[in-house]
């Protein structure tokens, strides 16, 4: 969909990602926002060099673990003109008690429960770095997401609004963690419309007739 608007995409499977083998999937254990973040920035550096892209011509987006990384990235660099975090998390401590994974997932990832290692959980939570965020952020979340509860986006949205940062929160009623692939047709179409509106708004400042019409409709 983004390609139809003239955007290129740089995709990567960093440490912690799936589809490149167990070693890669396990490589971010204990260190969410560490090696994975560095590898993604290397991908951006390489693509920028190969295609002569300026610093202000980049957006960043991701869902689930990629949504976590999006929230993390914009708290650690200002190189992106806009960001989209879908079904994301921002607070590893609070997520541990609200996700359908319960406490076991965090116990595996961080070798202990939140109250055993509170500093470690918060050090690897994007919400901790919210004051450093200057990138406009679009949050997309289904309110029946049990894996990454919508309260995670609510936390991020509330914090950014409190700090007078630029943020937009799209809440999709009745949609689960898999909305982008298995959601109702109208919600999936609305999601695409939001993505294009947000990217056009910040990556194409001059705008187009289509972008201007969509902004009026949002």
Where are these regions (language model features)?
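Active-site-proximal cap/loop segments of hydrolase catalytic domains
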Residues: 1-5, 9-218
């Amino acid at each position: 969909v983004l390609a139809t608007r003239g955007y290129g995409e740089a995709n990567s499977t960093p440490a912690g990602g799936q589809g490149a083998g167990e070693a890669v999937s396990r490589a971010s254990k204990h260190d969410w926002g560490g090696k994975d973040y560095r590898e993604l920035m290397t991908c951006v550096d390489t693509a920028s060099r190969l295609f002569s892209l300026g610093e202000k011509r980049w957006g960043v987006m991701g869902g689930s673990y990629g949504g976590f990384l999006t929230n993390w990235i914009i708290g650690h660099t200002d190189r992106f003109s806009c960001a989209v975090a879908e079904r994301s998390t921002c607070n590893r401590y609070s997520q541990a008690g609200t996700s359908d994974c319960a406490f076991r997932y965090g116990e595996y990832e961080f070798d202990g429960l939140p109250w055993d290692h509170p500093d470690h959980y918060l050090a690897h939570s994007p919400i901790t770095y919210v004051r450093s965020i200057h990138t406009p952020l679009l949050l997309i979340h289904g309110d029946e997401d049990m894996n990454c509860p919508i309260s995670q986006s609510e936390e991020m949205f509330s914090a950014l609004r409190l700090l007078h940062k630029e943020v937009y929160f799209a809440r999709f009623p009745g949609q689960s963690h898999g909305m982008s692939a298995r959601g109702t047709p109208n919600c999936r179409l609305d999601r695409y419309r939001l993505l294009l509106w947000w990217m056009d708004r910040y990556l194409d400042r001059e705008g187009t007739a289509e972008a201007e019409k969509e902004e009026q409709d949002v």
